[in-house]
Amino acid sequence: MDKKTIYFICTGNSCRSQMAEGWGKEILGEDWNVYSAGIETHGVNPRAIEAMKEVDIDISNHTSDLIDNDILKQSDLVVTLCSDADDNCPILPPNVKKEHWGFEDPAGKEWSEFQRVRDEIKLAIEKFKLR
């Protein structure tokens, strides 16, 4: 069976979508190709890297990428992780499903916010896997 493709999108591909890609590969990797991107690129937030390292997931080699139309078109599911990405997501082909899983942006906030958002994203992906 061919793997399906899930594409996590947020504003800057800096925190939330990077953590979602890390968790997605860890939790869904057997059945899904997992990618992330942003409406813009802000660079991978070092605190997102550190938060994922704390749970033994290495995202230090991830890059902050703009939405790739080829990946977008071949995705089975696009998941927006913030309202900006949800509002500005490109028009999707009819075969691509879209869901919005909103998470607060931890950038510029306390360390505990990175941990909280990281753990919320993990829970959302675990629930998704059970569907």
Curated annotation (Swiss-Prot):
Catalytic residues at: 10 (nucleophile), 82 (nucleophile), 89 (nucleophile)
Catalytic reactions on record: arsenate + [thioredoxin]-dithiol + H(+) = arsenite + [thioredoxin]-disulfide + H2O
For this chain's UniProt record, which GO biological process terms are given?
A: response to arsenic-containing substance
Which keywords label this protein? Arsenical resistance, Cytoplasm, Disulfide bond, Oxidoreductase, Redox-active center
Does Oxidoreductase count among this protein's keywords? yes
Q: Name one GO molecular function term.
A: protein tyrosine phosphatase activity
Q: Which InterPro entries match?
A: Arsenate_reductase_ArsC, Ptyr_pPase, Ptyr_pPase_sf
Q: What does this protein do?
A: Catalyzes the reduction of arsenate [As(V)] to arsenite [As(III)].
Record's HAMAP family? Arsenate_reduct
User: What is the name attached to this protein's record?
Assistant: Arsenate reductase 1
The UniProt gene name for this protein comes to arsC1
